[in-house]
């Protein structure tokens, strides 16, 4: 069985500090909800969080590490006592440039990252549909950008919503 489009669930779990969970599904992808991780945060909170009697294991960053993807994205990890994340999101042809920076805790994740929605550019819709992707996508659960116009039903939730959404999908959690 293959399960697709799990990034919002994984983001919500790790953003809320959960590293051990069982999720049962009766379809090959979870519901899209409102296009953000926020509905999953609410489900996690309503189910409750139970701490295990097993200590967490972490990797300790002792020196700077930089990784660059084939697409040109750059990730730099620096040693720190806090879990601070900064992200700059630049769209095609520099159409959108946004920045977000925060010390991440479950509380800041819930308020500052989880509500940020999926977004795409209008010209990317046809290729995505032809690949059989975004089947549950609509203007109610995604921000669609056409030129300089937002086609979505709801206005932006944050002035830098795209940067926050990209950051939320890194599947973050605060080290303890």
Q: For the regions a protein language model found, what residue spans apply to each?
A:
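C-terminal regulatory domains involved in ligand/effector binding and gene-expression control
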Residues: 1-19, 24-173
